[in-house]
């Protein structure tokens, strides 16, 4: 049995040879990182995934930066503000939001193999996920809502900014059909939807998408769950970034904490990040590299199960992680006891 067992006994179809070549290329390029990370994932340590727009590109959703079609380059910084909305709600919706975010292809988007791998990691390992994406694809991939913080919001949900309204901070509006506000015979499916600004069901004032805008902060609405996110950051032992450009506040928080506490960080992206110290890179498209990591994890679990093959390794992984987690807790208790003994 060799370390390359991940690729043994594969049935190669002529129609997918090119895909398998890409997989093998990515695997060999990142082999040491896959092996190391898979072992760390089985160690019982707490893992936190932080996902960005790059994860959803394969699902047909434009990234925010670093591509020719990126939403970032399409005036998002100018228009993505509460100030712009207050100046002209109709223009905000029709000129900006419905052209860059709440579009039919975004609403119809499905999770790709990267999302599905993360969902499996959450199930196997009990990991948590903080996403910068508003596309709801982690939920579509069956990540439990209690294991997910959508720190930048979610499309098809809305908020009010009228002072004193319960939807200003405490609650989220989830019962509005945006197409009901269409004008001039336009529709979402035709890609030309124009609307009159939707109104708050409570105070009847124009409402905003439930999305963190550039002149807002994470504590501007409870939906963004910033306190929960910060707790997860403090508790985690290993941080795995996927498809992020490290250009927003939440990634800065994670990096500062990880570096100060000397915690391990891994980055899945199409390029190697060289400006952040202590960050190990797995280079390649996340819809390929994340399933490869899952295979490596299954292989490591099989090795620790004395090579016994099983139909599904989920329970084996959970058992190994649980056992190692208990060992870690026992070791920490011993260290705490030793440090508390007076000399």
Swiss-Prot record:
It is found in: Nucleus. The keyword Zinc applies. It catalyses: N(6)-acetyl-L-lysyl-[protein] + NAD(+) + H2O = 2''-O-acetyl-ADP-D-ribose + nicotinamide + L-lysyl-[protein]. The keyword NAD applies. InterPro entries: DHS-like_NAD/FAD-binding_dom (IPR029035), NAD-dep_sirtuin_deacylases (IPR050134), Sirtuin (IPR003000), Sirtuin_cat_small_dom_sf (IPR026591), Ssirtuin_cat_dom (IPR026590). Pfam families: SIR2. Its EC number is 2.3.1.286. The active site is at 152 (proton acceptor). GO terms for molecular function: histone deacetylase activity, NAD-dependent; metal ion binding; NAD+ binding. This is NAD-dependent deacetylase sir2E. The gene is sir2E.
């Amino acid at each position: 049995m060799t370390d390359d067992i991940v690729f043994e006994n594969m049935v190669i179809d002529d129609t997918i040879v090119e895909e398998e070549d890409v997989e093998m290329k990515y695997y060999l390029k990142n082999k040491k990182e896959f092996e190391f990370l898979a072992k760390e994932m089985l160690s019982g340590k707490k893992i936190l995934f932080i996902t960005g727009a790059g994860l959803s590109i394969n699902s047909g959703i434009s990234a925010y930066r670093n591509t020719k079609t990126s939403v970032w380059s399409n005036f998002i910084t100018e228009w993505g503000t509460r100030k712009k909305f207050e100046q002209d709600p109709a223009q905000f919706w029709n000129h900006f939001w419905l052209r860059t975010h709440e579009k039919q292809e975004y609403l119809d988007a499905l999770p790709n193999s990267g999302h599905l791998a993360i969902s499996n990691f959450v199930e196997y390992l009990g990991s948590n996920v903080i996403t910068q994406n508003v596309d709801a694809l982690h939920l579509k991939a069956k990540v439990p809502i209690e294991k997910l913080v959508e720190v930048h919001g979610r499309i098809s949900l809305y908020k009010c900014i009228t002072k004193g309204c319960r939807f200003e901070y405490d609650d989220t509006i989830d019962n509005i059909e945006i197409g009901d506000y269409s004008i001039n015979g336009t529709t979402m499916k035709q890609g030309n939807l124009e609307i009159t600004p939707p109104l708050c069901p409570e105070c009847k004032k124009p409402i905003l998408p439930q999305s963190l805008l550039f002149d807002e902060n994470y504590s501007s609405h409870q939906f963004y769950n910033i306190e929960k996110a910060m707790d997860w950051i403090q508790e985690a032992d290993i941080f795995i970034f996927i498809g992020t450009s490290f250009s927003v506040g939440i990634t800065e928080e994670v990096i500062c904490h990880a570096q100060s506490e000397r915690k391990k960080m891994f980055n899945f992206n199409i390029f190697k990040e060289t400006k952040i110290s202590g960050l190990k890179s797995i280079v390649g498209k996340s819809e390929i590299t994340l399933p490869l990591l899952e295979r490596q994890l299954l292989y490591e679990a099989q090795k620790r199960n004395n090579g016994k093959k099983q139909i599904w390794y989920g329970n084996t992984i959970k058992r190994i992680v649980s056992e190692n987690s208990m060992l870690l807790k026992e070791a920490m208790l011993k260290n705490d006891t030793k440090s508390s003994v007076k000399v």
